[in-house]
């Protein structure tokens, strides 16, 4: 009987490096936030929570592992 390769599944959530559309500030955010994530410089909303994966309103530059 063959065992599966991964007994523990990898999480589907990731950290993202995003760029604010209003001011150009780069910030690291979580892909599944529980609260709204705002830009630290101008206060614009970058990610809105939805009970699962958040709605990303900024430009995603990189997906961090």
From Swiss-Prot:
Disulfide bonds: none
Quaternary organization: Part of the 30S ribosomal subunit.
Cofactor list: Zn(2+)
Signal sequence segment: none
InterPro entries membership: Ribosomal_eS27, Ribosomal_eS27_Zn-bd_dom_sf, Ribosomal_zn-bd
GO MF, one example: RNA binding
Cofactor note: Binds 1 zinc ion per subunit.
Binding-site residues, Zn(2+): 20, 23, 39, 42
Residue spans, zinc finger C4-type: 20-42
The protein's name: Small ribosomal subunit protein eS27
Gene Ontology CC: one annotated term: cytosolic small ribosomal subunit
Family affiliation: Belongs to the eukaryotic ribosomal protein eS27 family.
Pfam families for this protein: Ribosomal_S27e (PF01667)
One GO term of the biological process aspect: ribosomal small subunit assembly
């Amino acid at each position: 009987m063959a065992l599966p390769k991964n007994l523990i599944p990898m999480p589907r959530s990731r950290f993202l490096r995003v760029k604010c559309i209003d001011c150009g500030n780069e910030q690291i955010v979580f892909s599944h936030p529980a609260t709204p994530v705002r830009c630290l410089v101008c206060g614009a909303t970058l990610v809105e929570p939805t009970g699962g994966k958040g709605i990303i309103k900024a430009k995603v530059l990189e997906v961090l592992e």
